[in-house]
Amino acid sequence: MTTQAAEVAKRRTFAIISHPDAGKTTITEKLLLMGKAIAVAGTVKSRKSDRHATSDWMEMEKQRGISITTSVMQFPYREHMINLLDTPGHEDFSEDTYRTLTAVDSALMVLDGGKGVEPRTIALMEVCRLRDTPIVSFINKLDRDIRDPIELLDEIEAVLKIKAAPITWPIGCYKDFKGVYHLADDRIIVYVPGHGHERIETKVIEKLDSDEARAHLGDLYDNFVEELELVQGACHEFDKDAFLKGEMTPVFFGTALGNFGVDQVLDCIVDWAPQPLSRATHERSVEPTEEKFSGFVFKIQANMDPKHRDRIAFMRICSGKYEKGMKMRHVRLGKDVKIADALTFFSSEREQLEEAYAGDIIGLHNHGTIQIGDTFSEGENFGFTGIPHFAPELFRRVRLKDPLKSKQLRQGLQELAEEGATQVFFPERNNDIILGAVGVLQFDVVASRLKEEYKVECAYEAINVWSARWIECDDEKKLKEFKDKAFENLSVDGGGHLTYLAPTRVNLSLMEERWPDIRFRATREHH
């Protein structure tokens, strides 16, 4: 095996997805602790604590206790190199999260055992399904009252439409939580409370049918054995092929706060989750072990460092090897650039990078020339596919306070839209400018950045738009007919794509019925 193939085989690149407050920040911290990346866990605490999350670094995040922007953290574990992408849990930032999911090879879904499947989890799972991303599930908060575990598995299957195969099974919960039973290995991993901030040696009882197990479970023993028979009869057995196809999720139980069960999840990612995979481009498929370098940008983050006012483009390496000072082609611009100062991330610790391989995430300094979806290669002209734009869910008309600044306003809105958190639309029938976003928070962010960076003051007005759909049609004649009829509701987005702005859900359903030849797309790719 070449050095490069060996390096690729070591890589595991995954994201954590969850509904806000399911415990994602805590589990991130515990994973870093497993990799000994944080000496004392407890630095990644949200909201109420004064020790702030190493992965929640932006000022607005610190104030609100939510991860707004995706952080990337790399750490070693069991002779592998783990790239962990933390995704925003706050609902306003789902686009950022969606695109992060294009940069990973697997995902860890964290569910609150007391609440089960929640809305944001459903939305994120839909995105994982678009790419058949393998999903590992962790049911968290076993140190509190949780719902019936069998009910939770049924809900995962019914709502998320994926087979659930329990790998571990909880013994009691809340004050009676005794640990978990590993179904395939026939052993009990004992829960020792109160060790959230340190790694402790795991205590294991081999075989459920043993005196030691009976003594540990006490009164719970007989009921647990019965429950287990039911579980083994009713639940799926784990099938690695089905997992790799995105059809089945292995399920683990534990408590991230109590630092219990997280190591089993990380072991599962190392043992079962895929190493970096081949990636599709418009021209061909690119293998991670190819000698020549390639990668794509899935995120741009402004002002990551208050000390240096900068923008960083996050790039997923898809093939070859990055070496300091190498030349690479910025395919969209057709230009060769020398990259001497790419960054690797240990959350807010940014370090200059000497080399990196497929699966790794590196940061490039961006002076306004790099856009989301851009491909970099070592000379070859191809573009990676599948980096999505999603239809916004909220719309506002933008009103300029100084009419003489309309040029700056257009430029500002288009440049901010390039970062991918908002989208701008220009209606065909008038000179309005409409801003679309996935959450209210983004409108505030845009207004303050327009004022700061472009010296433009704007206000927002309500507008009668329910949703946007990108229009595609193979039949020119039908498309022209549609454009004439739907003229009132048509606009062009910042990238020049024809878009239908539907005033209501009913209106959109009617249009889809009336125009079967027109495709109303809720997503489109970055080109």
UniProtKB/Swiss-Prot annotation:
Residues at which GTP binds: 18-25, 86-90, 140-143
Coiled coil (residue ranges): none
GO biological process: regulation of translational termination; translational termination
Chief place where the protein resides: cytoplasm
GO CC list: cytosol
A GO MF term: translation release factor activity, codon specific
Pfam families: EF-G_D2, GTP_EFTU, RF3_C
Keyword terms of this UniProt record: Cytoplasm, GTP-binding, Nucleotide-binding, Protein biosynthesis
tr-type G domain sequence ranges: 9-277
InterPro entries in the cross-refs: EF-G-like_DII, EFG_III/V, G_TR_CS, P-loop_NTPase, PrfC, RF3_C, RF3_dom_3_sf, RF3_GTP-bd
Compartments (UniProt record): Cytoplasm
UniProt key word Protein biosynthesis: yes
Protein family: Belongs to the TRAFAC class translation factor GTPase superfamily. Classic translation factor GTPase family. PrfC subfamily.
Function of the protein: Increases the formation of ribosomal termination complexes and stimulates activities of RF-1 and RF-2. It binds guanine nucleotides and has strong preference for UGA stop codons. It may interact directly with the ribosome. The stimulation of RF-1 and RF-2 is significantly reduced by GTP and GDP, but not by GMP.
NCBIfam families per the UniProt record, alphabetical: prfC, PRK00741.1, small_GTP
Cited HAMAP family: Rel_fac_3 (MF_00072)
Protein name in UniProt: Peptide chain release factor 3
Taxonomic placement: Bacteria, Pseudomonadati, Pseudomonadota, Gammaproteobacteria, Pseudomonadales
